[in-house]
Amino acid sequence: MNWKGCLLPLALPLSVLVIGSWRLAVFDRPPPSQPALTGSAQDLRPNYAQAPPGTYPTCQDDPALADLLLAEGRRLGVTVRAGQPELPGKDATYRAEPGRLGPITIKQRPMSPVVRCMLISHEFIHVLQHLQGDLKGVLLLGWSTAHPDPIPQEAEAYGHQHRVGYVLSLLQATPRTSAN
């Protein structure tokens, strides 16, 4: 990594990060209700960087697992709502918020159960990336991918969005914070 890559995180405040794009911060949010992970919660969480094994069900195998992802998200404090995603042309977005899990917004449109599953799994990979960054940033999990998206977090999510069973297992192993 060159010196410019080291300085990039300092040049871009976290409040303007929306997965896949940079945007202005939203200042009319309610006060944070979910603190950053404490030391003990960090110790109990799974290893998000562990590469997905091929032993878990995929969206092709069981697209209904998307509903379990949504339930785990609610347990952890992720708000999922229907509406217009923050990024133009996207069917869903996750907004990483400093110090707490953010919301997922999903566009309501007809889609097959498998596509819906991959869409939801994709957004929860961004949740895992946010957890990997201790709710302070959105870090790569380190799962290898050949997906060509120029944004590394997006490439990682697109490259593994079919791995719903593994994403679900990581969310199920993630402890709730004390505010939940």
Model-predicted segments: where are they?
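Short active-site segment of divalent metal-dependent hydrolases/proteases
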Residues: S121-Q129
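Long, well-structured alpha-helical subdomains associated
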Residues: H162-N180
